[in-house]
Regions:
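Alpha-helical transmembrane segments and their immediate juxtamembrane cytosolic regions
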Residues: 1-178
Length: 178
């Protein structure tokens, strides 16, 4: 959690420089969204696994704890949307969704594809049809193939290289195109 927070801070300036070529709007980078998504997962686990008892029925208490576990995820998603985190509520919801379905890959794929179609379908309803929404929907759905095929084994230990890639490539693109 701390590592994601630190990389969110480090990556913010390169992100703002790159983003300034396209818009004057302020937003937080993807590491901020990943940080908030992980925080939502940690809070969900903490709340849903707590031993808070409303009644003597353990199954009922467990169900209530799980339901209350969703509250921080929803609130953090709303905060992400209001505070202009990259991908906003959608980003936090998808991170949480992947965690929630971590042991059910087929369920994850079905839910994710359905969520993508609904998201871009709503955009078409609100803003009118544009082929770009179809391309965005397809581009959003395609990565689920790689997620589905992931075998759960850690790859080469190049974690910090991958972390560094994000701000470095944004700076390179900024200086090349500015």
């Amino acid at each position: 959690l701390l590592r994601l927070f630190c990389f969110a801070i480090i990556s913010q300036v390169p992100f703002m420089l790159f983003d300034s070529m396209f818009t004057n709007n302020f937003s937080f980078n993807i590491f901020g969204t990943l940080f908030v998504g992980l925080l939502a997962i940690l809070l969900y686990d903490k709340i849903s696994n707590c031993t808070f008892e409303l009644t003597k029925d353990k199954k009922f208490n467990l169900t209530i704890n799980k339901i209350f576990g969703f509250v921080p995820a929803i609130l953090l998603g709303i905060i992400s949307e209001v505070c202009y985190f990259d991908y906003g509520f959608w980003g936090v919801a998808i991170i949480f969704l992947f965690y929630f379905f971590k042991n059910d890959k087929l369920g994850m794929v079905i839910f994710y594809i359905t969520a993508c179609i609904i998201k871009y379908g709503i955009n078409i309803i609100i803003y009118g049809y544009h082929y770009l929404y179809i391309l965005l929907c397809i581009g959003t759905i395609l990565p689920i193939i790689f997620i589905y095929l992931y075998n759960g084994k850690q790859g080469k230990k190049i974690k910090y290289l991958l972390y560094a890639f994000y701000p470095v490539h944004l700076l390179i693109l900024y200086f090349v195109f500015k």
